[in-house]
Design a protein with these regions (language model features):
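Ser/Thr/Pro/Gly-rich, low-complexity intrinsically disordered stalk/linker tracts of secreted
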Residues: 3-238
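Core sequence-specific DNA-binding domains of diverse transcription factors
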Residues: 25, 31, 38, 42, ...
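Short, solvent-exposed loop/edge segments of extracellular or virion-exposed proteins
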Residues: 86-88, 240-246, 602-607
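Short, solvent-exposed loop/linker segments at the N-terminal edge
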Residues: 102-108, 121, 245-251, 611-620
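Short, ordered beta-strand-loop transition motifs
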Residues: 104-107, 157-171, 307-310, 435-436, ...
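Short polar/acidic secondary-structure junctions
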Residues: 120, 177, 246, 629-631
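Extended, charged catalytic domains and RNA/DNA-binding interfaces, predominantly
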Residues: 251-252, 256-306, 313-701
Length: 701
């Protein structure tokens, strides 16, 4: 509907012409006097309208299931999976049964389904709509070209009824007579020689969607009991070795070794089967790049590890008694010849805080992402080796909005709470406040209650109203892709200092830090970058997060050409929700575009994210200290002082320990560091802010 809105009409006028029953809430214009510079008002109006569509009881009724799946890019053109005709098997969105068909990512398939009419029937002139999940790379259903990709057919099993294809929109019209309850229709996706192409991202329970418009009046609803299949990874092509960011001297260390396919999907290990519990054994060579020797770490040059075929290997050893940085390279042998990975730098130091890695923004198949919530957390913990993660499905964006379904919202929350493990793997409940008027924000709750305040509810459809609804809760909000597309942040509403101390400056969408960032967010708007907002007086610390839609939290960039993503580095006293909340409120964070370095910046006694008093003597100077442990040779270091930049050469080093005297910082200024590595890796420290002397004195008094 949005794509067909005439350019000559305003979104409201066009929407009302399509949906005469819809009215905007009274006072809407006064409620929203200023919008995001690229606000998608048509999307907001459509969400409001769809929430109030007057459906008939027969719309969305019926059920469907898969009867056969045939791989067309392998040898025999026979059904590779033939299921029993008759009753569909029990289905669960999170626990797909063994009998669910499984197909490889990006494969060509012919998928045969049966649709059974619901208890109220379908009138003559009623419509069926067929499509795979629209997110992200299934081939589209088309009804015109039998030789083309995605060609789909529908045939009635009963006399006197035919399914007339309507090419504009992949509808089938019921022609001849009405369909009675229980009558069946055979549907084939990929009916021609080209088949249909399966999504490139693996997921359990991928849905073949069927919508029923029982009266042909233009309103339809999705079947709740529809057909599903599992999409599985191809052979592994990349090994990923990840360890903790930081440990204390003498602490135990665990490195995880995972294998993924070319699109970042969790794959299965090759190797020698142990014959026990589906486990395989492999051999790995270990080398030190720099730092303590293998002998000092108690490691051998080659080690044999055993794990389940689809689980990570775990390499365990003990940190040395002295401080320093551990750098290891791990290489597969025999069946894993050609697989290798450098481990992220592991800093050994005695400190009241430690660095942890978090991805605080991502989506599952319950909105516009990939995979079940359960698989999302499995990937975050076992493949990406995150310390903390949040699943932030959209409040009202996707096929079944969670702000309309208490059951779906409860499922997401229950799964998040179930995976939580204090001191090891912290899950933070949340959702995305998906405002097409004022910009998207994800909302995180540092407790076990996570109410959804929807961006299309009149009471909470502005940022200030969202913050008032959250006031008093242990919660934070984060603006993201704030400088450009898909919708920029409306900075007219200044970030609430209590509830929004941080902002996401990098994700799969690009970088919203500044116009001179290495890869700015697409569709960037001049003056709407985060640095512009800081210059205007806002105080925001920096994080990155993936905004993953591919089911790969923590490694969202693996499937992108530039490997662009986002991660949050957080210095916390404890690995639990209260500790993380305190650290984020204090802005003790830094952002990366997916890499895992170690970064600490201070000016005089002020740490990243903190405020420091201005000195009355304008000739006074400050001592800047930067420590950085890189994941690739350092290309350059940018010292960013309000609107000015000083560029330092990186000289290809892996470590940086720099002290530098910088000129007097005036009240209202801020200072942060941006470090660029070979291969495109970028890290940003949170700014340090300069207070007027009087402000600091008043606070002290």
């Amino acid at each position: 509907l949005a794509e067909s809105t005439p350019a000559s009409e305003s979104p409201a006028e066009s929407l009302l012409s399509y949906a005469p029953w819809f009215r905007l809430p009274e006072g809407w214009d006064e409620q929203h006097p200023v919008l995001s510079p690229n606000a998608k008002t048509e999307a907001h109006f459509l969400n409001l309208a769809e929430r109030n569509i007057p459906l008939s009881a027969a719309d969305g009724a019926g059920r469907a299931w898969i009867t056969a799946v045939t791989a067309l890019d392998s040898e025999p053109d026979e059904p590779s999976i033939r299921l029993e005709e008759g009753e569909p098997r029990e289905k669960s969105r999170d626990d797909a049964p063994v009998a669910t068909p499984a197909v490889q990512v990006s494969s060509l398939q012919r998928i045969e389904l049966v649709f059974e009419v619901g208890p109220l029937g379908i009138e003559e002139g009623g419509l069926l709509y067929v499509m795979p999940e629209p997110f992200w790379s299934w081939s589209e259903v088309q009804l015109e070209n039998p030789m083309g990709l995605g060609y789909t057919t529908a045939l009635s099993r009963v006399e006197g009824v035919r399914l007339e294809p309507i090419a504009d929109g992949a509808f089938f019209e019921i022609v001849g007579r009405a369909l009675d309850p229980g009558e069946r229709i055979d549907i084939v996706m990929g009916a021609g020689p080209s088949g249909t192409r399966v999504d490139e991202y693996a997921e359990r329970g991928s849905e073949i969607l069927i919508a029923v418009d029982a009266e042909g009046d233009g309103t339809r609803a999705w079947l709740e009991d529809s057909a599903r299949l599992d999409i599985v990874a191809r052979e592994g092509t990349q090994m990923i070795a990840l360890g903790p960011a930081e440990v204390a001297p003498g602490d135990p260390i665990e490195i995880t070794l995972a294998i993924v396919d070319e699109r970042g999907n969790r794959a299965r290990w090759p190797g020698d089967s142990t014959g026990v519990d589906n486990a395989v054994q492999n051999t790995f060579a270990i080398e030190t790049i720099d730092g303590p020797s293998l002998i000092a770490l108690g490691l051998d040059e080659a080690t044999h590890l055993v794990a389940a075929v689809d689980a990570p290997y775990r390499l365990r050893f003990t940190a040395p008694a002295s401080e320093g940085t551990i750098r290891l390279s791990i290489r597969g042998l025999h069946a894993l010849e050609g697989f290798d990975s450098d481990v992220n730098p592991i800093v050994v130091r005695q400190s009241a805080t430690r660095l942890i890695w978090a991805d605080l923004h991502g989506h599952s198949q319950l909105s516009d992402g990939t995979g079940t919530p359960e698989d999302y957390f499995h990937y975050a913990r076992d493949i990406a080796r995150l310390d903390a993660v949040a699943l932030t499905d959209h409040d009202h964006w996707g096929l079944r909005p969670i702000d309309q379904s208490a059951e779906i919202a409860a499922k997401i929350l229950e799964t998040s709470l179930r995976f939580h493990e204090r001191d090891r793997f912290v899950t933070i409940p949340g959702y995305e406040w998906t405002s097409w008027l004022h910009g998207h924000r994800h909302v995180l709750y540092f407790e076990e209650d996570a109410p959804i305040y929807s961006a299309i509810d009149f009471a909470t459809d502005r940022p200030d109203e969202l913050w008032e609804a959250l006031r008093g809760r242990p919660a934070l909000t984060f603006a993201h892709h704030s400088a450009g597309e898909p919708v920029a942040t409306n900075w007219f509403f200044q970030p609430d200092p209590e509830l929004e101390p941080l902002t996401e400056i990098t994700s799969i969408h690009g970088m919203s830090e500044a116009a001179d960032a290495p890869l700015p967010v697409y569709g960037a708007i001049e003056g709407n970058y985060v640095r512009d907002v800081l210059i205007r007086g806002a105080r925001l610390g920096f994080i990155g997060s993936g905004d993953s839609h591919n089911g790969h939290p923590g490694l969202a960039g693996l499937a992108t050409a530039a490997e662009q993503s986002g991660l949050a580095g957080i210095f916390t006293a404890t690995l639990d929700r209260p500790g993380l909340l305190d650290a984020m409120r204090a802005r003790h964070t830094f952002a990366t575009n997916g890499i895992r370095p170690w970064l600490s910046v201070s000016i005089d006694d002020a740490r990243m994210g903190e405020a420091m008093p201005s000195r009355e003597d304008e000739q006074a100077t400050h001592r800047l200290h930067i420590r950085y442990e890189a994941t690739a040779p350092i290309v350059g270091v940018d010292l960013i002082r309000t609107g000015r930049i000083a560029n330092l050469e990186g000289n290809g080093a892996l470590s940086l320990d720099l002290e530098r005297i910088i000129p007097h910082l005036a009240p209202g200024e801020f200072h942060y560091v941006r470090i660029i590595q070979e291969g495109g890796g970028v890290a940003w420290s949170s700014p340090i802010f300069i207070d007027p002397v009087s402000t600091m004195a008043t606070e002290a008094n």
